[in-house]
Swiss-Prot record:
One of its GO terms (biological process) is carbohydrate metabolic process. It comes from Chelativorans sp. (strain BNC1). The active site is at K192 (proton acceptor). Its EC number is 1.1.1.94. This is Glycerol-3-phosphate dehydrogenase [NAD(P)+]. GO terms for molecular function: glycerol-3-phosphate dehydrogenase [NAD(P)+] activity; NAD binding. Pathway: Membrane lipid metabolism; glycerophospholipid metabolism. Sn-glycerol 3-phosphate binds at K109, G137, S139, K192, D245, S255, R256, N257.
């Protein structure tokens, strides 16, 4: 039987906290790093994370710290549950205390706004010597934290590393599949955020379940088209990190991206909402498809709604008015 690991989880938001709880349930030692000293005190003393994961009791075995070196000391693996736009800077700090052979699993889904890089590309520049992998799939933090069944994909360019990590990170309620298609897994996780905003906007505008289904399905066509252009495998995008995640996030207000889109569709003020990762990704994704001459009208429409003043109803009319074609 393989030995248990000490796992450092960077980021004590909902996802990081849920991952730390799950790793502890799997028998690993779990340390949780957070910037916020008040949050660290709440986790360690009240055994709760009321801001990000209300109603979930945190096991006393999960220890939180705001000291990066202490979080990483003796760690066998790092789970980086940092928002995509902050990942590079946090990993640069972690790199000063992290041994070069320790694997780092990227648990954020997005594209870096300033560079247009996927998470593994940004992480590679921050941590040039560490083995890198990505964890992605249809998963809500609240479900995972409460012990509900969840399945994800763990991907790395080294298939053996991915398989080993998938085995180690699996837990009683978390089934991890492995893949060596890192590009496909990362693209699926990043682009579904944009498509979920489209689905949410359609729902929020009261355009009906049929329209949401159409947006989701045609959005998946765009995801596969973009994936093929970047070398992702079709079967990866048909799996948990592509289609699976798309189905979940395009149909649930638990998704920040869907909820953001729904508020947009209802014409509500957006400045008080938690910023969804798809807001950052939309403009980058639109640029990616434009530079490669790809057809992605839904992604371009989301970018138009977020950055070009396009209304939801005008966007839907424009999509419906596109030339008819075979499916």
């Amino acid at each position: 039987m393989s030995r248990h690991w000490t796992i450092a989880v960077l980021g004590a938001g909902a996802w990081g906290t849920a991952l730390a709880l799950t790793m502890q349930r799997a028998g690993h030692g779990a340390r949780l790093w957070a910037r916020d000293q008040n949050l660290v005190r709440e986790i360690n003393n009240a055994r709760s994370n009321s801001r990000y994961l209300p109603g979930v009791k945190i096991d006393p075995a999960v220890l939180a710290t705001d000291d990066m070196a202490a979080a990483l000391e003796g760690a066998d693996c790092v789970l980086a549950a940092i928002p995509a736009q902050s990942l590079r800077s946090v990993l640069a700090v972690a790199g000063t205390a992290l041994k070069a052979h320790i694997p780092v699993v990227l648990c954020a889904k997005g594209i870096e706004r300033e560079t247009g890089q996927l998470m593994s590309e940004a992480a590679r520049q921050a941590l040039p010597e560490n083995p890198l992998a990505a964890l992605s799939g249809p998963s809500f933090a609240a479900d995972l934290a409460r012990g509900l069944p969840t399945a994800v994909t763990v991907a790395a360019q080294d298939g053996a590393l991915a398989a080993d990590l998938a085995k180690k990170l699996s837990a009683p309620n978390l089934r991890c599949y492995s893949s060596d298609d890192l590009m496909g897994v990362e693209l699926g996780g990043a682009l579904k955020n944009v498509l979920a905003i489209a689905a949410g906007a359609t729902s929020g505008a009261g355009l009906g379940a049929s329209a949401v289904a159409a947006i989701t399905t045609r959005g998946f066509v765009e995801l596969r088209r973009i994936g093929a252009a970047f070398g992702a495998r079709a079967e990866t995008l048909m799996g948990l990190s592509g289609l699976g995640d798309l189905i979940l996030t395009c149909n649930s207000p638990q998704s920040r991206n869907f909820a953001y889109g729904a508020a947009l569709g209802r014409g509500e003020r957006l400045d008080n909402l938690p910023l969804a990762e798809g807001v950052f990704t939309a403009s980058i994704a639109a640029r990616m498809v434009s530079e490669r001459g790809l057809e992605a009208p839904i992604i371009e429409t989301v970018n138009g709604m977020l950055n070009g003043g396009l209304t939801v109803h005008a966007a839907m009319q424009a999509l419906l008015a596109r030339p008819l074609k075979s499916e």
